[in-house]
Amino acid sequence: TDAQFKVKHTFDRKNELAILGLGAIDDMKLNTGMEDMSEKNQYILAYLPVVKQKTYTLGAVYKHYSGKNIYSLIVSRSQLNNKNIKYKDNDESSEENLTLNYRSDEIENKLRSENIFRFPFFRLNVGGNLEYATYTNRTYQKQFTTIPRVINYHTDLGLLKWGLYATAIYESDNERFTASLGVRADANDYSPEMNNLLDQLSPRLSLSYRLFGAVYLNGSIGRYYELPPYTVLGFKDNQGNYLNKANHLTYIRSDQAGLGLEYRPSSYLKFSAEGFYKKYDQYPMSLVDSIPLASKGTDYG
């Protein structure tokens, strides 16, 4: 089930407010009463948990117009709630049959302020953001291995994040050449390795040049930083300590470069062919098999 809404109000020629929201509910059920109970279907039903997911985002955007310049203030709140439940033989008649009960919540509250200044052939965007996020995880799981064991895990995490950014965009008089130069810096209060904006400084440059007609040559290069997943940030050891904080976890870094051709036959249609190079560094890895977490699939045990 999905739902969304948007309400926009114009106070006067210089001020407007938009409020919007969207949400989704996924409520999965196992079809244990199917007629074709083949061996394959029995296997799938035996390990697949019941998944329930709820997510929503609510936000408001205030804009003030001053000549060619625009000031924006954006506030939003989003939540992702996940539940995975599994009973042995899908028999819910007794709690003794419960083999998995996973519940997690990710909540983000965001505030962003942005100014857009317009000049002849030139535009400047500057802004900053402040966010507070919470993450909780409650997991009960019975593992039937060589030595059966019960996992009873819980964690809570609160994280304050902040950032600054600026982008300058130039466009020639005949619109033949366009250049964009930007920089962004992010930090948070998770650990000393993450609370300095200069340690996560992200410069980026993109260029576009019209070779002839509607054919353009595009190129870009930049460095980007990404916060590790909340599951990694909030992971605790048996003593209740954030394990990856002690491991000096840092932002994930990605250096990227791209080059390509673009054909724009009209204002609403374009064709492009591009090549990219990406190099990742400081990516979290699994200690069990030394595989980056991005390459590991989901295993319901």
Regions found by a protein language model. Name each.
Residues 5-9, 60-64, 111-117, 164-170, ...:
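Residues on the lipid-exposed face of transmembrane beta-strands in outer-membrane beta-barrel proteins
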Residues 14-17, 68-71, 81, 121-124, ...:
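Repeated loop/turn-to-beta-strand initiation elements of outer-membrane beta-barrel proteins
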Residues 16-65, 71, 79-107:
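Flexible loop and strand-edge segments within Gram-negative outer membrane beta-barrel domains
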Residues 19-25, 73-79, 126-132, 181-187, ...:
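Transmembrane beta-barrel strands of outer-membrane/channel proteins
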Residues 25, 31-38, 74-98, 136-143, 158-192, 209, ...:
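Surface-exposed extracellular loop regions of Gram-negative outer-membrane beta-barrel proteins
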Residues 50-54, 64, 99-178:
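Outer-membrane beta-barrel transmembrane domain signature of Gram-negative proteins
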Residues 104, 108-114, 152-165, 246, ...:
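Outer membrane beta-barrel strand-and-loop segments of large Gram-negative receptors
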